[in-house]
Amino acid sequence: ARRWALMHEYREAAEPEPHLDALLARLGEADLVLVEGFKHEAHDKIEVCREGSRREPLYPGDRSVVAVASDRPLPDANRPVLDLNDTQVIADFICRHCSLAERVA
């Protein structure tokens, strides 16, 4: 398979992070783009919540979090909770959520 990635190393702490739209404009047509970071941008997200993390989760107040990938049960998540260690379940969710399941099958 052929792949293409765009990575940028910040050389100075003061360098501003670009907006996601500006980065997406650099890409050609794609069926799916997976993005890490940009948690405050308005795009669908899968939040990772690990046991023992002291970080406050986004999902209670962020409607753009469409699922949570976790290594523990989250009974009050009010959205799908995916097993963090089951990459096939996560990939299947992404394909269904993005209506790609028919193309992959």
Regions found by a protein language model. Name each.
Residues 61-105:
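Conserved NTP phosphate-binding and transfer environment spanning the P-loop NTPase/kinase superfamily
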Residues 40-61:
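Conserved C-terminal guanine-recognition region of P-loop GTPase G domains, centered on the G4
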Residues 1-46, 80, 91, 101-105:
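ATP-dependent carboxylate-amine ligase catalytic core
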Residues 23-29, 55-70:
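Short, Lys/Arg-enriched charge-dense amphipathic segments
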Residues 33-35, 46-50, 64-71:
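Short, hydrophobic beta-strand segments that form beta-sheet elements in well-ordered domains
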